[in-house]
Amino acid sequence: MPLLFLWFFLTSTSLVSALQTLPCINTTYFIPNSTYDTNRRVILSLLPSNVTSHFGFFNGSIGQAPNRVYAVGMCLPGTEEESCIGCLLSASNTLLETCLTEENALIWIANRTICMIRYSDTSFVGSFELEPHREFLSIHGYKTNETEFNTVWSRLTQRMVQEASSSTDATWSGAKYYTADVAALPDSQTLYAMMQCTPDLSPAECNLCLTESVVNYQSCCLGRQGGSIVRLSCAFRAELYPFGGAFTVMTARPLSQPPPSLIKKDSGKFSTETIAAIVVPIIVVAIIFLVLLVLSRLFARRRKSYQEIDLDQSGITTLHFQQLDFKTIEVATENFAKTNKLGQGGFGEVYKGTLVNGTEVAVKRLSKTSEQGAQEFKNEVVLVAKLQHRNLVKLLGYCLEPEEKILVYEFVPNKSLDYFLFDPTKQGQLDWTKRYNIIGGITRGILYLHQDSRLTIIHRDLKASNILLDADMIPKIADFGMARISGIDQSVANTKRIAGTFGYMPPEYVIHGQFSMKSDVYSFGVLILEIICGKKNRSFYQADTKAENLVTYVWRLWTNGSPLELVDLTISENCQTEEVIRCIHIALLCVQEDPKDRPNLSTIMMMLTNSSLILSVPQPPGFFVPQNKERDSFLSSQFTMGCTSQTKNDVTITNLDPR
């Protein structure tokens, strides 16, 4: 469904009023006082308190389709709670008063601080779109030496884009992609500027969003006393005065003085430094352009052009995707050399390769003897080509020939999670912070598959070896050969062919062949427990633990009041015990025997990101093996450290699903 958003950027009276020039326009509407309208009002009323309690950023949803409302709220980092709440309330009221029947809206507003609210009838977190954008400019002109101003402008904006988009923080907060800065202008004026991206973007996406916004500003607003560029996921504003609280929280730096090259000579001519500053960048850009042009043509000769592959699966009949010939794959992998072999999965081997343009890739060569090879190939191409998320491995192309079926993925340098997690010599590299971030990243990836992507995907084979780690240890879910598309109204499906990894499969799948999104939840629960203990779930069959499996072992520790005995010894002295116990609690809820008792991924995300939410009491897990007269007794109050009962939050477990 196409989305058309309402834009506001209410600042000083010097900016053109968006209220008059940009009425709420949309292709979809709701009926006033309908369920959608009620949900919209409820989630907008909840945003201020949740944004301030979640480091300046919060995203959530409320209701059930087709009346589900998704919303995001964000304030500047360092904003006082009262100012943030006031700004968000003002933004909410503006939306409610102006967008009377529109299902989609976005507002950036400047009051005592700057804040943003966006809501929609479809999920948008994790998606990146450059357009549409809106421009707001001062009605007052500004005249100065253009050459001198442009030099100061370029230095300031380039520095700010780099600073704002270079965050490696895995947490979502309003401070993740943010900067505010000032620069001294030649005419004794001061230029004030701020940039901010929503934290669901990748650093590269934030960089592109802000770079394009600076370019747009140069086209619309240079020569004016100020202006703003706003997009779905970022905003840029520059003025000749401090605004919206942005400069009460900025990193202090002395005002930059005009460089020596800007000092006018008595002769009235440009200095050598000024000429060099203009000419050298032009020459460098020209050389880079020529090199890229030559490389692109060389690469184009060595590969086949984009071709169609007909994959009739669940309504997706035609994909346009890069097809590589087998010779190119052989060269890239050095004829599938053993030294390039990364691993072996259920349907084939994986090799590291380097394409002619220098791109490192992971090449998955499906087994020729696998009866399911052709189907798994079609399935994986169809699904992964439609999925775009930072916590999912990216498919770059494929090779399809009579005797070969090959998938080409992005190369992830740190191999898979099991490579570190289950190796006593390497598991120490995964401290608790990294493990906790990995759990969060996997949660976001599965949530995207289950709820936020255009298709509803059940992975069916979540395990440590299918979680890849990039250079920053950010997890990426891989291996979609067994994944299935779930119908909109289909909660449970059946299969006669039970495939997967024992220990990760839930009881209803092993016994009855039934799978659903709750099957992935069970697998994820087992995976969380493995991440905490640093042991494979199947190792508990041989270990002297008096338990038949991992979930039984954990359940006994839990009921005995000693859950921390599960923790990997390499991290036990430097972990956050409250976080560890909460993760064990969540994992036990994920591995409940009855699928209905397992939380969905949006609820799991809520549990991980909001420590004040009270978790329900787990019952004995699926595949729990009782010992003698063991009974399922449990005191829930023992393991809710730091949790406080809050009426609003009690409701959010079922109604407000952050992602």
From Swiss-Prot:
Membrane-related topology note: Single-pass membrane protein
Keywords, comma-separated and alphabetical: ATP-binding, Glycoprotein, Kinase, Membrane, Nucleotide-binding, Receptor, Repeat, Serine/threonine-protein kinase, Signal, Transferase, Transmembrane, Transmembrane helix
Compartment annotation: Membrane
Similarity annotation: Belongs to the protein kinase superfamily. Ser/Thr protein kinase family. CRK subfamily.
Range of residues in the leader sequence: 1-18
Catalytic activity: L-seryl-[protein] + ATP = O-phospho-L-seryl-[protein] + ADP + H(+); L-threonyl-[protein] + ATP = O-phospho-L-threonyl-[protein] + ADP + H(+)
Protein name: Putative cysteine-rich receptor-like protein kinase 12
Sequence ranges on the Extracellular membrane side: 19-274
Protein's UniProt keywords contain Phosphoprotein: no
Pfam families: PK_Tyr_Ser-Thr, Stress-antifung
Active-site residue numbers: 461 (proton acceptor)
Domain Gnk2-homologous: 19-124, 131-243
UniProt-listed CDD domains: Gnk2-like, STKc_IRAK
Parts forming coiled coils: none
Domain Protein kinase: start-end pairs: 336-613
Molecular function via GO: ATP binding; protein serine kinase activity; protein serine/threonine kinase activity
Annotated transmembrane regions: 275-295
Keyword Transferase in record: yes
Assigned EC number: 2.7.11.-
Glycosylation (residues): 26, 33, 50, 59, 111, 145
GO cellular component: membrane
Enzyme class: transferase
Predominant location: membrane
